[in-house]
Amino acid sequence: MRLLLVFLSLCFLGTVHAQDSIAAHYKIYNVKSKQLISVDKIVTDMNNADVLFFGELHDDSVGHFLEHKIFEALYQTYGDKIALSLEMFETDNQLVLNEYLAGKIDEKRLAKDARLWNNYKDYRPMVEFAKANKLTVIAANPPRRYVSIVSKGGMQPLLELSKEAKKLLPPLPYDTLPGRYREKFFETMKGSPGGDNPKVYYSQCLWDAGMS
C-alpha cells in the first residue's frame, strides 16, 4: 500500500476566529523536501498514494480548515467519486443525516436529533460542501451505547444483540489489534481511570473498526 503522510507546520500571525480568515495564518511544510507546499500539491501527490494520513485534533480549527480545502480539491479532481466519512455522526443517525442532505429537515433538527458536537462549526463547511454537490456523507461511528456495553461487559454481549442492532456495527467479531497498537494504548492510558482494563481497550477497537 502506498502511503502519503502530511506534516503541517502551522504559523499563526494572530488570533483566528473564522474559517474565512484562516488562510493567511498557516503554512504547509514538506519535511522531506524541506519546502513549503500547497493544498493542490498534496492532492497531486495523492496520485502516487492509496492513503493520505492527516493528523488532527478535534478542537483544532486550522486543521479542519485544511481538511476542508483538501476535500474541495479532491472533488475538483475526482468529482462524485469521493465521499465524506465523519466520526461525529453515529451509524444510527445515518437516516437523519441523509434527510438533512436531501433537504427534508433543517439544520436545527439535525443538530438536535444527531447530537452534534459543540464544535460542529469547524466541520460544517465540509458537510455543506457535500450537501451542495450531492456527495455521500457517512455516519461512521458505532453508537456510543454499544461502545459502553463493551467497556463494561466486553465483546461477548455484542453477539447477543438483535440483527437490526448488529447492522449498526462493524462485522463481528472485530479485530482487537494485538501488538504495538495495544501496547501504545495502555502506555497512553496508564494512570487514567480504567486505563488498565482490557474492556476499555476493546471498546476503543470497536470505534476503530467502525470507522475504518
Q: How does the language model describe each region?
A:
Residues 3-13:
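Sec-dependent N-terminal signal peptides
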Residues 8, 17-49:
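N- or domain-start disorder-to-order transition segments that initiate the globular core
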Residues 34, 39-75:
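Zymogen propeptides
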Residues 57-61, 89-93, 143-147:
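Solvent-exposed loop/turn segments at secondary-structure junctions
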Residues 82-90:
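Short internal beta-strands
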Residues 95-212:
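A substrate-binding/cap region within the structured catalytic cores of diverse enzymes
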